Amino acid sequence: MADPVRLIVGLGNPGREYEDTRHNAGVWYVDALARRQGVFLTEDKKYFGLTATFSFEGETIRLLVPTTFMNRSGQATAALANFFKIPVTQILVAHDELDLPPGCARFKQGGGHGGHNGLRDIISRHGNSRDFYRLRLGIGHPGSADRVTPHVLSKPSKADRDLIDRAIDEAVHNTADMLRGDLNSAMNRLNGFKA
């Protein structure tokens, strides 16, 4: 068994102009998980984000949506993790993933940042540790590098958003395995899903 997850972070950019953009897929996941748990995210300036907690099998699980911009996501993640003494190996970061098509989602542990500025900052703010879990939410690639920024900062089509939402629903359904530290089960179940 791997370490159980105690902090779940949803990456995105703050503000109404970004809330429906592909780059906020991680936020969509945390919002969906909060709804399923019946909790509400509220602003907590001490942690530079929106936070909530819920109980799972006697353990406190913390949710965080940084209200910093994407490239400063580590500021919020480190502030909360350090205060509650949550090791990096017990953090799950949900983020948009260019290398997966809409409708696909994958759990994994460790790895690089793959050019994702939110992951880059989290790695940097946690002593260059890459050992946190990731939930990679497919948003598709626009085809060329010069189109990546406009792609991630734009809204997906209705069809793509429906696929992303279905993948998020499946990820939420499989989050319990991550909270128990059963990465293999979570990966196997989610990797077998295709919206």
From Swiss-Prot:
Compartments reported by the entry: Cytoplasm
Assigned keywords, A-Z: Cytoplasm, Hydrolase, RNA-binding, tRNA-binding
Active site: 23 (proton acceptor)
CDD domains: PTH
Segments passing through the bilayer: none
Transcription in keyword set: no
Catalytic activity: an N-acyl-L-alpha-aminoacyl-tRNA + H2O = an N-acyl-L-amino acid + a tRNA + H(+)
GO terms for cellular component: cytoplasm
Cross-referenced PROSITE patterns: PEPT_TRNA_HYDROL_1 (PS01195), PEPT_TRNA_HYDROL_2 (PS01196)
GO MF annotations in UniProt: peptidyl-tRNA hydrolase activity; tRNA binding
Residues at the site labelled Discriminates between blocked and unblocked aminoacyl-tRNA: 13
Residues binding tRNA: 18, 69, 71, 117
EC number: 3.1.1.29
Site feature: Stabilizes the basic form of H active site to accept a proton: 96
Top-level taxon in the UniProt lineage: Bacteria
Function: Hydrolyzes ribosome-free peptidyl-tRNAs (with 1 or more amino acids incorporated), which drop off the ribosome during protein synthesis, or as a result of ribosome stalling. Catalyzes the release of premature peptidyl moieties from peptidyl-tRNA molecules trapped in stalled 50S ribosomal subunits, and thus maintains levels of free tRNAs and 50S ribosomes.
NCBIfam families in alphabetical order: pth
Protein name: Peptidyl-tRNA hydrolase
UniProt gene name: pth
